[in-house]
UniProtKB/Swiss-Prot annotation:
Source organism (scientific name): Streptococcus pneumoniae (strain Taiwan19F-14)
SUPFAM superfamilies for the chain: Peptidyl-tRNA hydrolase-like
Gene Ontology CC terms: cytoplasm
Amino acids binding tRNA: 15, 66, 68, 114
Source organism superkingdom: Bacteria
Alphabetical list of InterPro entries matching this protein: Pept_tRNA_hydro, Pept_tRNA_hydro_CS, Pept_tRNA_hydro_sf
Stated role: Hydrolyzes ribosome-free peptidyl-tRNAs (with 1 or more amino acids incorporated), which drop off the ribosome during protein synthesis, or as a result of ribosome stalling.
PROSITE patterns: PEPT_TRNA_HYDROL_1, PEPT_TRNA_HYDROL_2
Lineage: Bacteria, Bacillati, Bacillota, Bacilli, Lactobacillales
Subcellular location: Cytoplasm
Biological-process GO terms, alphabetical: protein quality control for misfolded or incompletely synthesized proteins; rescue of stalled ribosome
Keyword Cytoplasm: yes
Name of the protein: Peptidyl-tRNA hydrolase
Amino acid sequence: MTKLLVGLGNPGDKYFETKHNVGFMLIDQLAKKQNVTFTHDKIFQADLASFFLNGEKIYLVKPTTFMNESGKAVHALLTYYGLDIDDLLIIYDDLDMEVGKIRLRAKGSAGGHNGIKSIIQHIGTQVFNRVKIGIGRPKNGMSVVHHVLSKFDRDEYIGILQSVDKVDDSVNYYLQEKNFEKTMQRYNG
């Protein structure tokens, strides 16, 4: 069996640790814990790392297509490896949740998130496992674009680091249990 764990974000130093790159931050954390490094794959338009866990190959994926085209990389990888939608887990930021809150879902709309919208368009379904990490709404009249492309302030960053640990725990639990429904019951709350 093979699993794809995909963190959404934008490539490049300009976007490093911005709110929209929470998915990349989590995937980087998982790679660090597994002591694996990323290599860029031009065909898949993604940075990839992999490891084995309980006999399963786990791919850590950071699409390099920029957020709004993330579905291209996800679709290419699913197709190439002949994977089912159940083998996919997407990790991304959510404006409508408080900073640092997490929510696991097995289906749903894009909710205004262009990366998720792209994935839904490319794979043809809204039914796929996902972990949402809250980044909060813009404050003081700030535009959504400016908000998601800005860095966290100190207090927000502390909350995000705590959520990254919780998401890391939930992803590891999911990989061990091989049951997303059970993982949602344990970590949503």
